Every structure is written in structure tokens, then in C-alpha cells.
Amino acid sequence: MTALEEFNKTIDQHEEWIKRLTNSEREALFVAERDGEIAGFIMFQSPDRKRAAHTGTFGIMISKEHRDQGLGKLLLKTLLDWAEKHPLIEKVSLAVFSTNERAIALYKKFGFIEEGRKVNEVKFGENEYADDILMYKSVK
């Protein structure tokens, strides 16, 4: 999971992004709200290439103050339910930092399988790296 704080965009950029997502057959956005504010969201995108239209990748972000409340689990279940009903989507994919053990455990609990790894893909500081683990789940 990525921190919501890392997703820096202007209000206008957010509005344009949400408009695009709500009018797309290849993209989905599900938002978790708590006490009138966005607590997190999950976004799915499927490529417009015909040979890859059966696949898609998602990213999930939960704000720090709303973690450990089951929102990630709820958002992931919502996305997978949507993907299972989608007429084209057969495979849902993600990338997760190897240091994010809690997220990896959640994805495995939902049936995601590791299919690859980008070694030292993410650099946190001087000589501090993490792999980017690629995972997928078949939904058909």
C-alpha cells in the first residue's frame, strides 16, 4: 500500500482524474470515507490494447490515521467483486514493496500469487532498497 500522503495532486487534477475514471469502462475508483473525509481509495486501470484488455492493475492508498481499521480489506474486496462481474477482466495485478509485509499478507489472503520481482526497484535512502513484488489473481 502507498500512503495517501504520497499522492500529491492539486484539487483540479483530482477533479479531472475522478471525472475520467467515472466515465471509463477500463478504469474504476472506489473511495472509503470516514467522518466526511477520504480515508483511502483503490484505483484500477486496464490497458486499452486489445490483447491486454483482459488484465488490469490496481493501487490502493490508506491515510495513516485510518490504517488498521479494515479499510484496505474492504476496498480490495470491493474491487475484486467488481472485477469478477466485469465482462472483460480476467486478471487483476499489483506491485507492492517487499518491505510492506502487511500488505503482502493481505494480498496472499485474498489469493494473489507472486509472479515476479523487480530487484532493488525502490530506493528509500543511501544504500536502502526494496524489491517491487508483482502479484496477480485470476478472477474468472
Predicted feature residues:
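Loop/helix-junction capping segments adjacent to catalytic residues or to phosphate/diphosphate-binding pockets
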Residues: 52, 69, 101
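Localized chelating/binding microdomains
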Residues: 21-22, 37, 44, 72, ...
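Short, surface-exposed loop/turn segments at secondary-structure junctions
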Residues: 1-5
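Acetyl-CoA-dependent GNAT
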Residues: 6-65, 76-77, 138-140
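Conserved acetyl-CoA-binding loop-helix of GNAT-fold acetyltransferases
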Residues: 62, 68-83, 104-109
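C-terminal "cap" of GNAT-fold acetyltransferases
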Residues: 90, 97-104, 110, 117-140
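Conserved GNAT acetyl-CoA-binding A-motif
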Residues: 76, 83-95
